[in-house]
From Swiss-Prot:
Keywords carried by this UniProt record: Aminoacyl-tRNA synthetase, ATP-binding, Coiled coil, Cytoplasm, Ligase, Nucleotide-binding, Protein biosynthesis
Gene Ontology biological-process entries: valyl-tRNA aminoacylation
Name of the protein in its database record: Valine--tRNA ligase
Gene3D superfamilies according to UniProt: HUPs, Isoleucyl-tRNA Synthetase, Domain 1, Valyl-tRNA synthetase, C-terminal domain, Valyl/Leucyl/Isoleucyl-tRNA synthetase, editing domain
EC number of the protein: 6.1.1.9
NCBIfam families, per database record: PRK05729.1, valS
Coiled coil: 805-876
Taxonomy, superkingdom: Bacteria
Self-association and partners: Monomer.
Source organism of the structure: Staphylococcus aureus (strain NCTC 8325 / PS 47)
Family, as annotated: Belongs to the class-I aminoacyl-tRNA synthetase family. ValS type 1 subfamily.
InterPro entries: aa-tRNA-synth_I_CS, aa-tRNA-synth_Ia, Anticodon_Ia_Val, M/V/L/I-tRNA-synth_anticd-bd, Rossmann-like_a/b/a_fold, tRNA-bd_arm, tRNAsynth_Ia_anticodon-bd, Val-tRNA_synth_C_sf
Residue window of motif 'KMSKS' region: 520-524
Reaction equations catalysed: tRNA(Val) + L-valine + ATP = L-valyl-tRNA(Val) + AMP + diphosphate
Amino acid sequence: MEMKPKYDPREVEAGRYEEWVKNGYFKPSEDKSKETYTIVIPPPNVTGKLHLGHAWDTTLQDIITRMKRMQGYDTLYLPGMDHAGIATQAKVEAKLNEQGITRYDLGREKFLEQAWDWKEEYASFIRAQWAKLGLGLDYSRERFTLDEGLSKAVKKVFVDLYNKGIIYRGERIINWDPKARTALSDIEVIHEDVQGAFYHFKYPYADGEGFIEIATTRPETMLGDTAIVVNPNDERYKDVIGKTVILPIVGRELPILADEYVDIDFGSGAMKVTPAHDPNDFEIGQRHQLENIIVMDENGKMNDKAGKYEGMDRFDCRKQLVKDLKEQDLVIKIEDHVHSVGHSERSGAVVEPYLSTQWFVRMEDLAKRSLDNQKTDDRIDFYPQRFEHTFNQWMENIRDWTISRQLWWGHQIPAWYHKETGEIYVGEEAPTDIENWQQDEDVLDTWFSSALWPFSTLGWPDLESEDFKRYYPTNALVTGYDIIFFWVARMIFQGLEFTDRRPFNDVLLHGLVRAEDGRKMSKSLGNGVDPMDVIDEYGADSLRYFLATGSSPGHDLRYSTEKVESVWNFINKIWNGARFSLMNIGEDFKVEDIDLSGNLSLADKWILTRLNETIATVTDLSDKYEFGEVGRALYNFIWDDFCDWYIEMSKIPMNSNDEEQKQVTRSVLSYTLDNIMRMLHPFMPFVTEKIWQSLPHEGDTIVKASWPEVRESLIFEESKQTMQQLVEIIKSVRQSRVEVNTPLSKEIPILIQAKDKEIETTLSQNKDYLIKFCNPSTLNISTDVEIPEKAMTSVVIAGKVVLPLEGLIDMDKEISRLEKELAKLQSELDRVDKKLSNENFVSKAPEKVINEEKRKKQDYQEKYDGVKARIEQLKA
């Protein structure tokens, strides 16, 4: 297959993915004797197109599964998408609002039709993006969290947990979005620091003897106060415990109670209790059997319990209430106060802690089982390991999980209420006398269905499902560390509860993709990057390699166009190296022609040794998910060892008349390049397929090729030392040429004083490499080389490299040139010194700019010292 002179990612990638999918290369093996390897894709939300975080996440999964497929595993990489309840519903509602329509205008059934249309549209976008990224997914098994099979699993889990008493219906404080009018999970609440106020009010004692000071950031909630609490150990209030105060404006009498929850040192040490509008107050209220008074409705407006403030927006009520309290001389002070306020991730509304009747999952026993499992052989391994502590900490401090949502898009709760008796029926099927029952209108939290993802996608609850029996538990979960609590932990406890097994063996956690300056990517900052735009510019392979190798497990990744471009340059280097190799291998060279048992040269032995070392390193690091280190190992071997050194060295035999040596070189080129393509393939699937198809090969595709194996017979340890000596000599000569301003094209005499006779023999046997790379007019290698008076001498491992200067350069002219260069460097040093000693510059300039000037100074100083040393050497 022809390789064009220039690497063009568009040409290389065009049609390739469709060919892979059409030929079924990503389907699991039909050989059931193979060990399985499974990853189920973390399902992206059907709310929109994929971002860089998704690209990073799925690239890592694809690298792992491609590698395992090549290593002979029966590999399944299963695709799917999440209905993303509130997020998708918000998008669909926004679209309807543009037409002046609400979901209530349409009704539930028609609205859900609109939501399904949205899902189909965005699912096709997501599939197209998966294709552009080159993900090796088995589309015949694609799942969706609302499809029939998963709905069956969701109903079974809900009913089973209800029957076990783990799911219950009750009153709790939940996160309430008054704009979307639904409960929110903790992950759907974004906390932001907001400039607010701390209001200090007087609550007069009922006996008229003074007042108690109360501070709050939410004055509107005081209308629902039912008690004041103080710490029983607080000497200031020991005498008032049991007394009562009058709730300002309302006139209700509130008891003063003792509770150790109160922080003696915070504020006045006395705290108002509003059980219906604060989670901590609710717990206090439960302990003291306080009344729950809800003073707002679901829209965030004050209700009839708020008296004269009924109908007002909560924030308007706050202003009016403070004004009224001032008029009654009940305001002590108002302090500016920055505090963390929860906002709905979807609507942006300030979240209201709100007492509501919801469905909950009782978490204590489920969490305990998850923690206990981490002490067994069936434990889940976290990469990095430190995140296991994060997981354990959360499980130890877990609260019951609110699972009901006041939405239409999602799994409707399988609970029905009898129209006359109010009896609750929970079942996988509706009651037979359905006309007497009303189904709960709420849907389940999106995380409830996605918590079942590893096993519901494989056919559970059908325990006889072939996929479930063969591919569960899965092998690895790759996801962001930001959803350990909300997804990873829930999959673990649901997997253990319903399958008695961990849902995955390993959890590989990565960070967030950030902008180059370290800030979070966001629409408001305008610093987001569309991965598809990057692919259009540089190709999928460039983006994939950057994402995979640009960070280490558990750390954030800073996106950099410059670094993506450097990967593109790396691929160009590979492309050019492959083209040279293929031109020398020749079209008639076949796999069976590869013979590595012949008379291998030093360069052949060295590159084969380095190849085997790289295979071992890449395999070992990949097993530990250290893809950043893998990237460095591959880059160093391919760019430096293979392209810069071996390819150049291979020109010696290829330009000779020795046909036997040419054939050996062709074998080494072909074998090495083939193994490079195989190692690179999981990272760069498109370009490696293109090059591999042009190489002598067996099989239809590199996707199904075997992973490279270390061959002990092709490791020649002694070749590394000899090559190291030669490379050091070559680099030394080249550096000396630069220093005396003599181009490589000009032949010069070179003397090498070998450290001992053994080195002298080794260098003499391999002098062809020195002749090719150093271009000497004469080359003298000996232990007793006489060093001329005027010469440049470099000390190397093998001895000394000497360049006689007599006749090579005009000494006076060269000294004059170097002195002018020294003067220029001195002037640059003076300029930078002046800048860095300027207090005005140092105090006002950004740190980045200051560091850049310091770097320049260091560079100039190093150059200055080098030029000065050369002048002294020439004058000596």
